[in-house]
Design a protein with these regions (language model features):
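ABC-family P-loop ATPase nucleotide-binding domain
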Residues: 1-8, 305-311
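ABC transporter nucleotide-binding domains
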Residues: 2-5, 9-212
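Conserved protein kinase catalytic domain
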Residues: 73, 117, 220, 275, ...
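A generic structural signal for secondary-structure junctions
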Residues: 77, 103, 142, 216, ...
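ABC transporter nucleotide-binding domain
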Residues: 172-265
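C-terminal coupling/interaction segments
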Residues: 266-311
Length: 311
């Protein structure tokens, strides 16, 4: 359903995307994982025919982005990370407006809009003003909009961004239901663990390069038995993280949600030198524990030593 071959986007000497080879089969729910600026949005915009690559090829539903962009636009539902709404419209009016933009026949617009609301469990809000919706409800409305023309492929850029924990759970459940309806879904996120439960395949991207791609369980299996240590200190964690980067026992160090994650070097099983280093340099260590293997630790392990921006 989606395939990219040597897909590259440059701005001057800067590679926003570099030699991306990616393939999604029909029915895949594919998680595109990476921090902000990794190349996720660039990839999605190219697949949506909104951005031309510097070189390389991409196909969606068998159509080339170069020769058949109209066919691709008919086949996809694209939801950007930020989208606008019309403040003075009711929810049902908003969807009928976009149904008209999709050139859906007038007699069908209300039925199609009602169907989309039902798919995203938003029917109860059909007569509410768009401005009255919560952030989570607004995200659902955006998803309902891209479902109006019954696309085969969904390209969703950070659909859970800014949502509270409950809304994130509801969004994950919604994406899983859409996959069960036969949709092929590419969903990007910089929050690594939230995709583990719903995606059958994931790709890890950083600095425009795809570093790992495969079944979730296969990626997790690659890092089982490799310890990742989580540490917390008093005060900002970044200075302590910089100290740990100098430890020969540390193969990779990152900071996430106020916590320091350290991938131990090959053959290292004892994390005590990490604590000793922090204490010696005056950092007040409050906790240290070995992390369970999940997508977050898989990301740290699979990218260690590979994350330097090319000069």
């Amino acid at each position: 359903m989606i395939e990219t071959i040597d897909l590259t986007k440059k701005y001057g000497d800067f590679f926003a995307l570099e030699s991306l080879d990616l393939k999604l089969e029909q029915g895949d729910l594919f998680g595109f994982i990476g921090p902000n600026g990794a190349g996720k949005t660039t990839t999605i915009r190219i697949l949506s025919t909104l951005l031309a690559p510097t070189w390389g090829e991409a196909y969606v539903c068998g159509h080339s982005i170069y020769t058949h962009p109209r066919e691709i636009r008919r086949a996809i539902g694209y939801m950007p990370d930020i989208f606008g709404v019309y403040d003075d419209m009711r929810v049902i009016e908003y969807l009928e407006f976009f149904a008209a933009a999709y050139r859906i026949d007038g007699a069908e617009r209300r039925r199609v809009a009602e169907r989309s609301l039902e798919l995203v469990d938003l029917t109860v809000k059909r007569d509410e003003l768009v401005t009255s919706l919560s952030r989570g409800m607004t995200q659902r409305l955006g998803l309902a909009r891209v479902l109006l023309h019954d696309p085969q492929v969904l390209l969703l850029d950070e659909p859970a961004s800014g949502l509270d924990p409950r809304a994130r759970i509801e969004m994950r459940g919604l994406l899983k239901r859409l996959q069960e309806l036969g949709k092929t879904i590419l969903v990007s996120s910089h929050i690594l663990p939230e995709l583990a439960d719903i995606c059958n395949r994931v790709g890890i991207i950083e600095y425009g390069r795809l570093l790992a791609c495969g079944d979730v369980q296969d990626l997790l299996a690659q890092v089982r038995g490799r310890p990742v240590i989580r540490l917390r200190v008093v005060g900002p964690p970044e200075p302590a993280a910089r100290s740990l980067e100098k430890c020969q026992e540390a193969a990779g160090v990152t900071v996430r949600d106020g916590e320091i994650l350290v991938a131990l070097a090959d053959g290292v099983t004892d994390p005590s030198p990490l604590a000793a280093r922090l204490i010696a340099e005056g950092h007040a260590l409050t906790s240290m524990r070995e992390s369970e293997v999940n997508l977050e630790t898989a990301f740290l392990e699979l990218t260690r030593g590979k994350l330097g921006r090319p000069s």
